[in-house]
């Protein structure tokens, strides 16, 4: 497991809009992470950051987000 921005297909982050929103924690835990939160103005803008996300779940990597 590792910490990181959980990625949608095509290397895009799950966008979020509030540091205290429960949205990211839900997205992260649903995918097997210990927890998650909305990182505001992070490397990829406002995106969900997951703690202890399983290795088989994709994380955002450098490069373009292909929508």
Swiss-Prot record:
InterPro entries the UniProt entry points to: LCN-type_CS_alpha_beta_dom, Scorpion_toxin-like, Scorpion_toxin-like_sf, Scorpion_toxinL, Scorpion_toxinL/defensin
Major place of residence: secreted
SUPFAM superfamilies: Scorpion toxin-like
Gene3D superfamilies the UniProt entry points to: Knottin, scorpion toxin-like
Top-level taxon of origin: Eukaryota
Intrachain S-S bonds: 12-65, 16-38, 24-48, 28-50
GO cellular component: extracellular region
Keyword Hydrolase attached: no
Pfam families with a match to the protein in the record: Toxin_3
Keywords per UniProt: Disulfide bond, Ion channel impairing toxin, Neurotoxin, Secreted, Toxin, Voltage-gated sodium channel impairing toxin
Propeptide: 67
Domain LCN-type CS-alpha/beta: start-end pairs: 2-66
GO biological processes: defense response
Subcellular location as annotated: Secreted
An example molecular function term from Gene Ontology annotations: sodium channel inhibitor activity
Annotated tissue distribution: Expressed by the venom gland.
Domains (record comment): Has the structural arrangement of an alpha-helix connected to antiparallel beta-sheets by disulfide bonds (CS-alpha/beta).
Biological function: Alpha toxins bind voltage-independently at site-3 of sodium channels (Nav) and inhibit the inactivation of the activated channels, thereby blocking neuronal transmission.
Family: Belongs to the long (4 C-C) scorpion toxin superfamily. Sodium channel inhibitor family. Alpha subfamily.
The protein, known as: Sodium channel neurotoxin MeuNaTxalpha-8
Protein's organism: Mesobuthus eupeus (Lesser Asian scorpion)
């Amino acid at each position: 497991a590792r910490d990181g921005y959980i990625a949608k297909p095509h290397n895009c982050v799950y966008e979020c809009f509030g540091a205290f929103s429960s949205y990211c924690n839900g997205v992260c835990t649903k995918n097997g992470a210990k927890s998650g939160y909305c990182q505001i103005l992070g490397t990829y803008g406002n995106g969900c950051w997951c703690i202890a996300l399983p290795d088989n779940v994709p994380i955002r990597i450098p490069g373009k987000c292909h929508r």
